[in-house]
């Protein structure tokens, strides 16, 4: 078949050129080192260590045993909750607390600029000690974020729905983008043995936005919920590969951030009017956390 070029007007001047398409896998790297199957008796036993955040309520929800609770190295934790409930505030507090202990933290923000994150950090912690261990990277490019996340003791991605890569079509928050971004961070955590926290949005129904595979890919799923009237916040665990899911953490939101409430029964009893005629106290048991009311 003869073809005429619309530019020069000549016939049969077209040349067929094969264009190589770049194929990118959702699983960017294989973080495993296994070459062949091993017998269970030959597998080396590794004692599970944990990194304490200094926040007893938060550490207890993450789990542990023998008095050692906190973050498992190489674990990936998804923290979700309603908008404005305090997800970013809680993780920034954890990051600042770890910085005080000499840990190097990377906070990747896809929703705020570096200066906005600094304003929140100064409100939560007025001191200067340890601030040089906290690094802020404002970007929505997941590939850049992973490339920069080297040599840190903890990585926070806020939020996973804002992360995007040029390797995949779709807008931020779409299924291919969320799946790819999560797989990059999971590989980072497993290969470098660095814990990663992801902030996740929720839908109007109160479930994590995005594909259900997001919850399956991570090790721990935490949900932070709050009351509309009071500043009480409750942290629950709905999935935990390294601990129990029955624990809850109770916090109070004030101008200094989220303050742990260690004695929930005493706190809620003190808030009630003890002189109210006909007032009745009762005990309840929810998700293995006893309290009185």
Positions of the model-derived regions?
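Residues at the starts of beta-strands that form the adenosine-phosphate
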Residues: 103-105, 133, 195
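Conserved AAA+ ATPase core "coupling" helix
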Residues: 120-121, 219, 226-239, 246-249, ...
């Amino acid at each position: 078949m003869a073809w005429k070029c619309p530019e020069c007007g000549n016939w049969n001047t077209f040349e067929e050129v094969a264009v190589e398409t770049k194929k990118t896998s959702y699983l960017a790297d294989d973080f495993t080192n296994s070459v062949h199957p091993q017998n269970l008796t030959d597998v080396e036993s590794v004692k599970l260590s944990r990194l304490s955040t200094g926040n007893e309520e938060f550490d207890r929800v993450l789990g542990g045993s023998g008095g050692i609770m906190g973050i498992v190295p190489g674990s990936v934790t998804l923290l979700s909750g309603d908008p404005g409930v305090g997800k970013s505030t809680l993780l920034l507090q954890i990051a600042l607390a770890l910085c005080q202990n000499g840990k190097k933290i990377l906070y990747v923000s896809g929703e705020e600029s570096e200066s906005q994150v600094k304003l929140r950090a100064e409100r939560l912690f007025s001191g200067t000690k340890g601030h040089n261990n906290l690094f802020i990277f404002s970007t929505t490019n997941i590939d850049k974020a992973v490339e920069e996340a080297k040599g840190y003791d903890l990585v926070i991605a806020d939020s996973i729905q804002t992360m995007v890569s040029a390797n995949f079509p779709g807008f931020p928050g779409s299924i291919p983008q969320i799946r790819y971004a999560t797989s990059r961070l999971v590989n980072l955590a497993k290969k470098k043995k660095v814990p990663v926290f992801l902030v996740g949005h929720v839908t109007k129904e109160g479930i994590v936005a995005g594909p259900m595979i997001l919850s399956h890919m991570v090790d721990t799923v935490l949900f932070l919920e709050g009351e509309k009237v009071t500043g009480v916040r409750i942290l629950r665990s709905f999935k935990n590969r390294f601990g129990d899911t029955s624990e809850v953490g109770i916090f109070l939101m004030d101008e200094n951030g989220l303050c742990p409430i260690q004695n929930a029964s005493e706190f809620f009893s003190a808030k009630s009017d003890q002189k109210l005629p006909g007032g009745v106290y009762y005990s309840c048991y929810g998700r293995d956390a006893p309290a009185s009311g």
